[in-house]
């Protein structure tokens, strides 16, 4: 399994630091990739710029990329990029650009990134219970086009997986998304007009649908709630928790420690 964490240059580094120190602490570092909208290092963790490969010509089509340029300038001048606002507007373009970047890294002869059966995409405030997630993935076939998560029904004809609850792609689905290489307009977005959509999660679902890959929903196991807002009741009482959202800082530490103590 390859864990792919998405963060941003205007996002507090403490969120990633807490995640690395808790729920990601048991994951081998070679199984963790972190992407942002600028390249930097957080401790021993290297963060890749997920937008770096988007051409200057294509960037002109996306008004939000003025923030990307500002982030790079702040970094070059040694200024605090965390003081910039609006990172969520730029984030929608990272979703699919990251999938292309990973595929490129897998294809590079001199790159040590190994092929994995599964790719799990999370935010820095996503909490994942690894034992439960791995149990689910062991029952599924990574050789098939698998697109898994918690459905958002903004468009009844094309539900998309909620990114904050974690999105899982099989290697086969990642390959189908990237092969054959898309060469039309908006290439970093696989031809999807991401600007007109709510988020990169929706754009990803549209790109996958064009390739005949639909979402397999696993709500409430993939869940966008916190422990205090989950709607406990008879319909979900015996469902295992795979993920939760909006958990960071002390809350991330407390939940992780509680689970570790319970397992012990």
What is each of the regions a protein language model found here?
Residues 18-32:
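Short, acidic, metal-binding catalytic loop of nucleotide-sugar glycosyltransferases
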Residues 108, 117-118, 126-206, 210, ...:
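Conserved catalytic core of nucleotide-sugar-dependent glycosyltransferases
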Residues 37-116:
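Active-site-proximal specificity loops/subdomain of glycosyltransferases
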Residues 195-264:
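C-terminal catalytic/acceptor-binding lobe
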Residues 11-13, 40-43, 127-129, 155-159, ...:
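Eukaryotic short linear interaction motifs
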Residues 11-16, 40-43, 91-98, 129-133, ...:
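Alpha-helical interaction elements in eukaryotic regulators
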